[in-house]
């Protein structure tokens, strides 16, 4: 709740910014939208409103800015749990970032295209682009986007679960946990850890599944996540 006034203040100031013109203003607007959606998943809807307000100005954006706009718009939609229905825009965005992007931008672009295929029920294509996304991650770099990397492995875990591939699911979730901790995202690290129980349950290892649930519940409670603790056990 403490975050909400900050978000609203940012939105008000950015609506004013969106009325300005020039490359710097466009860059600032995109950066602010990205910062807002990174606060938490709920704030992504505020970022979408901001980006929607900027949409009439897209013809004034440079190509690089338009590509970043589309990349961030898809990122915000994904965080807000808005389903994708077409891959046409993200295919163009991926093609652009393959030639012009940083490792983090390429990772995000491939990830978003994978999420598009997830939503249109093309699981093999989703996994292909999730894998491509993880290959872009430069884990030797200090600015590696571990927050995105852990989410990619988390999504891979979900797809492997749906395809009844428990060992692949466990492998993906182990990496999701690892990179969530690197991103200092304790809550999602614990959620990924708890999600491993379904794979052990599928394998008939009921005791292992119960141990994971119990440990996850204790860790959730230790870190103050009582809601998740009650769900876990």
PLM regions with names:
Residues 5, 11, 17-233:
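A "functional boundary" signal
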Residues 1-2:
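N-terminal secretory signal peptides that target proteins for export/translocation
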């Amino acid at each position: 709740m403490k975050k909400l006034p900050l978000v609203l203040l940012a939105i008000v100031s950015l609506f004013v910014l969106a009325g300005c013109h020039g490359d710097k203003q466009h860059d600032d607007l995109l950066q602010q939208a990205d910062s807002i959606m990174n606060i938490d998943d709920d704030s992504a809807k505020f970022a979408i409103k901001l980006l929607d307000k900027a949409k009439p100005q897209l013809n004034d954006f440079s190509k690089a800015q338009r590509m970043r706009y589309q990349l961030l718009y898809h990122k915000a939609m994904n965080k807000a749990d808005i389903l994708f229905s077409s891959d046409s825009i993200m295919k163009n965005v991926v093609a652009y970032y393959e030639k012009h992007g940083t490792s983090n931008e390429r990772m995000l672009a491939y990830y978003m295209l994978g999420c598009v295929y997830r939503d249109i029920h093309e699981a093999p294509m989703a996994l292909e682009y999730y894998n491509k996304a993880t290959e872009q991650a430069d884990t030797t770099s200090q600015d590696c986007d571990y927050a995105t990397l852990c989410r990619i492995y988390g999504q891979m875990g979900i797809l492997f679960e749906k395809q009844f591939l428990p060992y692949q699911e466990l492998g993906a979730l182990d990496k999701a946990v690892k990179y969530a901790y690197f991103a200092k995202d304790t809550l999602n690290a614990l959620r990924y850890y708890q999600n491993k129980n379904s794979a052990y349950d599928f394998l008939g290892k009921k005791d292992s599944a119960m141990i994971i649930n119990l440990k996850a519940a204790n860790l959730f409670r230790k870190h103050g996540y009582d809601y998740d603790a009650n769900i876990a056990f």
